[in-house]
Swiss-Prot record:
Keyword Isomerase in record: no
A Pfam family it matches: Thymidylate_kin
Enzyme nomenclature, EC number: 2.7.4.9
Lineage summary: Bacteria, Pseudomonadati, Pseudomonadota, Gammaproteobacteria, Alteromonadales
Catalytic activity: dTMP + ATP = dTDP + ADP
UniProt cross-references to InterPro entries, sorted A to Z: P-loop_NTPase, Thymidylate_kin-like_dom, Thymidylate_kin_CS, Thymidylate_kinase
UniProt name for this protein: Thymidylate kinase
One GO molecular-function entry: dTMP kinase activity
Source species of the chain: Alteromonas mediterranea (strain DSM 17117 / CIP 110805 / LMG 28347 / Deep ecotype)
Length: 222
């Protein structure tokens, strides 16, 4: 049985890392084989691209350059880790996926929808996560949290306006996609974690039930 792909999205300072750890533990405790990924990154080549993307270069990095690097890393990760893991029955938990590009490069950077769609179609061929949790945080609060972690990278230095546009695109995309669940990350972290645990428990329960019904049907046809 094919595994499921669950992705956690959010602005800087939204609390993705702790939520991802929570999801991985919940799935493991439920008996799933779990693989964890991050974007950009997740394979040796994709990690090298990650460093390239985040480096503060002493030259102009165009919106299109940034976008193409993101998709190059994504295709490497899909080909070498995500697709094989899902086909082997593992559940994959991702720190970011295509929604990040749609929000950051499409919303924040202002890359045209035509360009975003064309590149996404070529790179992904319709593939998307089974479930996405978007941790919604006010950009000013998120940036303050990120600063508390240390020096900001090139993207984190983009400014408040950039992150406000990025957040607006995230929310717009979530409104039109039932597989994206918005989690209020402005709540105390304990409440955020409780909300996430509830979402994951319900999702796992539904798909374990589906798997059981499918198995019964297969047995009945034999």
């Amino acid at each position: 049985m094919r595994g499921k792909f669950i992705v956690v999205e959010g602005l800087e300072g939204a609390g993705k890392s702790s939520v991802i750890g929570l999801i991985v533990k919940a799935l493991t405790d439920a008996g799933m084989r779990v693989e964890q990924t991050r974007e950009p990154g997740g394979t040796p080549m994709a990690e090298a691209i990650r460093e390239c993307v985040k480096h503060d270069w002493d030259e102009t990095v165009s919106e299109e350059t940034e976008l193409l690097l993101m998709y190059a890393a994504r295709v490497q990760l899909l080909t070498n880790k995500i697709y094989p893991s899902l086909n082997a029955g593992a559940w994959v938990v991702g720190d970011r996926h295509d929604l990040s590009s749609q929000a950051y490069q499409g919303g924040g950077r202002g890359v045209s929808e035509k360009t975003m769609t064309a590149i996404s179609d070529i790179a992904l061929n319709g593939f998307k996560p089974d479930l996405t949790l978007y941790l919604d945080v006010d950009p000013a609060v998120g940036l303050e949290r990120a600063r508390g972690r240390g020096e900001l990278d090139r993207i984190e230095q983009a400014g408040l306006g950039f992150f406000e546009r990025t957040r607006a695109r995230y929310l717009s995309l979530a409104e039109n996609d039932e597989s994206i669940i918005v989690v209020n990350a402005m709540q105390p972290m304990e409440q955020v974690h409780q909300d996430v645990i509830s979402i994951i428990a319900n999702y796992v329960s539904q798909h374990i039930d589906e798997g059981s019904e499918s198995h019964k049907t297969d047995q009945g046809n034999n």
